[in-house]
């Protein structure tokens, strides 16, 4: 569906100097998936997204969408290719002097739809996004979530194959963000549209995406299935993002002053539902103190992470035996302090 091959994007600054915003990025995005690109501000993710509809041209490399090198198109051919690629923005970009229905109809008129087919299509798409009763409202009369729904309706009205989402929830509160993400998931499942979404929030990635690429300094430092990236982050930057998202950082005071061994334990799938800690407490006579932890469900797979303290003042070897038992029953054990 989308092939990004060794793409670099350079921006010229003053006095002939240039800045590399995207640095040698290669990605394959399959048809029908929801693919996330995550990174902090300045990571290059928005610039990379804009190469997918040629709003930004690569300085090097190629971008192919549906077998067509969109980075090489211009004129009429580019306009036709862009009709198959919808885009929604962080700040909605609605026309404030036009109604909801007129905002959606505008994209169809621009694409050359027959006049008689525009109104039925607008009604159909507003029903899909839950705004059938808001067709004659103006943007100023809408909430932030409703404005983003108009943006989504406008972006998918022309039956695109691809929907680009540029930080679609960053201007919304948590509850509204969840409803927008649920709508995007529904659109993906119902219409089969490939979605490419950029965000700085790993929670958004966890909620909606099938696969993810992590960007830092213009490079993709890690990519893979969302569950695998959360369960086994390889790059230091990804580890930092995941740790922050799961909120598993212990206060330094606890790390320094608690006796015994401190472990971070990863449970995957069925192991997240097994009484492993109860087993070691009974079998080895160690005291188990859970300091921090949670179980997340990514897709339909369980991912549990616990930070625990193990102590056995009168039997030092029991702790080592307990740790070994935990290693055999769980996906991963990290000794934070031993």
UniProtKB/Swiss-Prot annotation:
<dbReference type="InterPro" id="IPR003439">
    <property type="entry name" value="ABC_transporter-like_ATP-bd"/>
</dbReference>
<keyword id="KW-0997">Cell inner membrane</keyword>
<dbReference type="InterPro" id="IPR017871">
    <property type="entry name" value="ABC_transporter-like_CS"/>
</dbReference>
<dbReference type="InterPro" id="IPR050086">
    <property type="entry name" value="MetN_ABC_transporter-like"/>
</dbReference>
<keyword id="KW-1278">Translocase</keyword>
<keyword id="KW-0472">Membrane</keyword>
<dbReference type="GO" id="GO:0005524">
    <property type="term" value="F:ATP binding"/>
</dbReference>
<dbReference type="InterPro" id="IPR041701">
    <property type="entry name" value="MetN_ABC"/>
</dbReference>
<dbReference type="InterPro" id="IPR045865">
    <property type="entry name" value="ACT-like_dom_sf"/>
</dbReference>
<comment type="function">
    <text>Part of the ABC transporter complex MetNIQ involved in methionine import. Responsible for energy coupling to the transport system.</text>
</comment>
<protein>
    <recommendedName>
        <fullName>Methionine import ATP-binding protein MetN 2</fullName>
        <ecNumber>7.4.2.11</ecNumber>
    </recommendedName>
</protein>
<dbReference type="InterPro" id="IPR003593">
    <property type="entry name" value="AAA+_ATPase"/>
</dbReference>
<dbReference type="GO" id="GO:0033232">
    <property type="term" value="F:ABC-type D-methionine transporter activity"/>
</dbReference>
<feature type="domain" description="ABC transporter">
    <location>
        <begin position="2"/>
        <end position="242"/>
    </location>
</feature>
<keyword id="KW-0067">ATP-binding</keyword>
<comment type="similarity">
    <text>Belongs to the ABC transporter superfamily. Methionine importer (TC 3.A.1.24) family.</text>
</comment>
<feature type="binding site">
    <location>
        <begin position="39"/>
        <end position="46"/>
    </location>
    <ligand>
        <name>ATP</name>
    </ligand>
</feature>
<dbReference type="Pfam" id="PF00005">
    <property type="entry name" value="ABC_tran"/>
</dbReference>
<keyword id="KW-0029">Amino-acid transport</keyword>
<comment type="subunit">
    <text>The complex is composed of two ATP-binding proteins (MetN), two transmembrane proteins (MetI) and a solute-binding protein (MetQ).</text>
</comment>
<dbReference type="GO" id="GO:0005886">
    <property type="term" value="C:plasma membrane"/>
</dbReference>
<dbReference type="Pfam" id="PF09383">
    <property type="entry name" value="NIL"/>
</dbReference>
<dbReference type="InterPro" id="IPR027417">
    <property type="entry name" value="P-loop_NTPase"/>
</dbReference>
<keyword id="KW-1003">Cell membrane</keyword>
<keyword id="KW-0547">Nucleotide-binding</keyword>
<dbReference type="InterPro" id="IPR018449">
    <property type="entry name" value="NIL_domain"/>
</dbReference>
<keyword id="KW-0813">Transport</keyword>
<dbReference type="GO" id="GO:0016887">
    <property type="term" value="F:ATP hydrolysis activity"/>
</dbReference>
């Amino acid at each position: 569906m989308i092939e990004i091959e060794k793409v670099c994007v350079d921006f010229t600054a003053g006095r002939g100097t240039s800045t590399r915003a995207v640095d040698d990025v290669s990605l394959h995005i399959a048809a029908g998936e929801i693919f996330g690109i995550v990174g902090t501000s300045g990571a290059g993710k928005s610039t990379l997204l804009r190469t997918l509809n040629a709003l930004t041209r690569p300085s090097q490399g190629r971008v192919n969408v549906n077998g067509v090198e969109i980075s090489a198109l211009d004129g009429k051919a580019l306009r036709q290719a862009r009709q198959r690629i919808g885009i929604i923005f962080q700040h909605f970009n609605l026309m404030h002097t036009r109604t909801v229905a007129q905002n959606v109809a505008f994209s169809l008129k621009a694409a050359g739809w027959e006049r008689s087919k525009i109104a039925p299509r607008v009604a159909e798409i507003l029903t899909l996004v839950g705004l059938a009763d808001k067709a004659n409202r103006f943007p100023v009369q809408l909430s932030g979530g409703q404005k983003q729904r108009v943006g989504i309706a406008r972006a998918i009205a022309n039956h695109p194959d691809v929907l680009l989402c540029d930080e679609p929830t960053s201007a919304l509160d948590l509850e509204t963000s969840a409803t927008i993400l649920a709508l995007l998931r529904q659109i993906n499942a119902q219409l089969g549209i490939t979605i490419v979404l950029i965000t700085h929030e790993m929670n958004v990635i966890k909620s909606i995406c099938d696969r993810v690429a992590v960007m830092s300094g213009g490079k993709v430092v890690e990519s893979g299935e969302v569950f695998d990236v959360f369960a086994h982050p390889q790059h230091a930057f990804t580890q930092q993002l995941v740790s922050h998202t799961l909120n598993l950082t212990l206060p330094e005071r606890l790390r320094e002053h608690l006796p015994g061994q401190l472990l971070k334990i990863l449970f995957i799938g069925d192991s997240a539902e097994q009484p492993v800690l109860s087993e070691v407490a009974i079998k080895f006579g160690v005291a188990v103190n859970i300091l921090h932890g949670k179980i997340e469900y990514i897709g339909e797979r369980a991912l549990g992470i616990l930070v625990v303290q193990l102590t056995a003042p009168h039997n030092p070897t029991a702790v080592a035996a307990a740790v070994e038992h935990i290693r055999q029953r769980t996906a991963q054990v990290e000794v934070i302090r031993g």
